[in-house]
Amino acid sequence: MNGEVIIKAVRPDDAEELLEIYAPYVLKTAITFEYQVPTAEEFHARISDTLKKYAYIKAVLDGETVGYAYVGTFHDRPAYDWAVETTVYVKENCRKCGVGKKLYTALEQCMKEQGILNMNACIAYADEDDGHLNSNSLDFHNHMGYRTVGRFYKCGYKFSRWYDMVWAEKIIGEHMENQPPVRTFFEALPDIRKKYNICL
């Protein structure tokens, strides 16, 4: 992989190019338990909804989007505001080239500026590679400093078989008695631009 990977903020109008990356995961893998590829309109709405509060970023190489990452609400109740669920997808021909690491590093930086403390990953898991799922995602999260905190057995059904779900967690901030409120992505954006080399 030649050239420099640049991290940029996603806009809702990026829906179609991100969907091109996501669709093979839906159709070929159990990495996502989604059965149907969403429409561009639905994906546009998902991006818009995420950006109301959280970071949604993409990796661009030589003008082409090669991956994206974002976080979502861990739980709706306000007590969970400082925890998020993370997601990352990389284009098929760019996997194991450092794109995922760059995206997750940038995402973590954004989360720190927003005031997030706990980053949680919900990872589909199978004990053996079955052609639809292997241990790469869990291995990646372990490499990025996440630790496994739970496993749900045979809770997801896809491709006529059952898959486990592993929860992994990374603590990125200090838990205090009087915790400052979380900022939205756009409230934190000036500080993100100032501190980190992210072209947002």
Segments predicted by a language model, with ranges:
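A short beta-loop-alpha structural element at the N-terminal edge
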Residues: 4-18
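Acetyl-CoA-dependent GNAT
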Residues: 37-83, 87-93, 110, 171-174
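Glycine-rich phosphate/pyrophosphate-binding loop shared by adenosine-nucleotide-utilizing enzymes
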Residues: 3-5, 64-68, 163
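Conserved GNAT-fold acetyl-CoA-binding loop/helix
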Residues: 19-46
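Conserved GNAT acetyl-CoA-binding A-motif
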Residues: 111-136
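Conserved catalytic-core motifs of GNAT/GCN5-like acyltransferases
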Residues: 122-124, 138, 142-161, 173-174, ...
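A short, internal acetyl-CoA/4′-phosphopantetheine-binding micro-motif in the GNAT/acyltransferase core
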Residues: 87-95, 123-128
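Conserved acetyl-CoA-binding loop-helix of GNAT-fold acetyltransferases
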Residues: 96-112, 135-139
